[in-house]
């Protein structure tokens, strides 16, 4: 669920297996632009723009007096928190189901981690999802929250909000559509 893998076959020079030279040449040709700074500069620009969009959204929501609780104290999510300079001023706390994390704080951003049950009792205006790669599971688990007026914010892969008006469509589309 949290990664990928490569399948590699190696053989000696006297092996009956022959490498697919056409495929190898095509891969090397396709990867040629990666030897320049262009793709990396474009990626960097997109990351900066996206992190500014996330930060602005959270600042705007907080300026309106709304409550925001993070959802899922994950390593990937913590990278987003630190890159976007998100701290307890923007996200009051983070809900997680792992009891070993409760009462601890996120590295760098210093946001306290609480049980999901406590988050549900607090009824925040927004949940900011830090485990976006579990898109369907989050929506399924928090359907009642959404149907009672809560809003779920996914910052990645693109910033979007799920509410009771678009819940069914977003659930049907799934993570891959973003």
Predicted feature descriptions by range:
Residues 2-46:
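Flexible, glycine-/basic-rich loop-and-beta segments that form/coincide
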Residues 46-64:
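A short, well-structured juxtamembrane/interface segment
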Residues 61-82:
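Glycine-rich adenosine-cofactor-binding loop
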Residues 79-92:
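Substrate-recognition/cap helix-loop segment adjacent to the acidic, metal-dependent catalytic center
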Residues 92-97, 153-155:
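Short internal beta-strands
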Residues 99-105, 117-118:
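Conserved nucleotide-cofactor-binding alpha/beta core module
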Residues 110-172, 176-177:
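Phosphate-bearing ligand-interacting subdomains
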